[in-house]
Amino acid sequence: MNAMPKNWYWVLGASYCLHYNNSVKPSIFVVEDDPDISRLVRHHLENDGFSVRVYSTGANVISDAERQRPSLFVLDIMVPGKDGLELCRTVRQTPGLASVPVIFLTAKSSEADRVLGLEIGADDYIPKPFSPRELVARVKAVLRRFERPLPPSPLKVGDIAIDPAAMILTVGGQTVPTTATEFRLLDYFARHVGRVFSRDHLLDSVWRDTSYVTPRSVDVYVRRIREKIEPDPENPRYLKTVRGAGYRFEAPK
């Protein structure tokens, strides 16, 4: 067997993401009700080679995405009809869309707003006012995580089965939907059973681009993973907290 490339877990999710050197442009769905901002976002993304569809409300976004799945969503939170938070929740609950990255671009900029955005499944959170060049860089950074080939080997720990090629998590024989970031983080833990990792180590190893995430982001994702894999998330069997050090993944005895 060939040696597994170092840090391949950075890029889990390539099955849905288009490569930049592909003849098909990556498609971005932008939901923004301010026409000046939407024109600015469209201009900079299209200038960088992306195909962009802009929506001023959330009404038709999901139905259009199911017909033509985008590479990434850029969502304002405060839009008419189905707002950005509801759209993100719907994306994460919709088969075929659940692993598509979501970036919030919003005037809601408090720490509580950022944490809520991450908790419901966002992959990045950009407060307004924003730099268009930074937005394009963030879009590229999120897509880069998923653009390379996946390792083929599935993994099983206790009742948890991880199939990176299909990006499928099963727990007790039941398929459990995850976001791309949740999947990468869980896979990283499961391939290093028994090792303790600090939050900073996990940020460097799993997120790769750490410009928008903080150690608290790791806690948010750990809590969400526990809700999906643990019979009792308050008393975890698999994903344990090591006080003062970080987290450790354990195989059940």
Describe each model-derived feature in a short phrase:
Residues 25, 69-71, 96-101, 212:
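His-Asp phosphorelay/catalytic-motif detector in bacterial-type signaling
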Residues 1-29, 249:
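Non-catalytic signal-transmission and effector/linker regions of two-component phosphorelay proteins
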Residues 68-74, 79:
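Active-site beta3 strand of CheY-like receiver
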Residues 168, 172-238, 242-245:
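Positively charged, aromatic-enriched patches within helix-turn-helix-type DNA-binding elements
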Residues 80, 85, 89-94, 99-156:
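Basic, amphipathic DNA-recognition helix from helix-turn-helix-like DNA-binding domains
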Residues 36-47:
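Charged docking surfaces used in two-component/phosphorelay signaling
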Residues 32:
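Conserved acidic carboxylate
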Residues 49-57, 61-64:
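Short hydrophobic/Thr-rich beta-strand motif most characteristic of the beta2 strand and flanking loop
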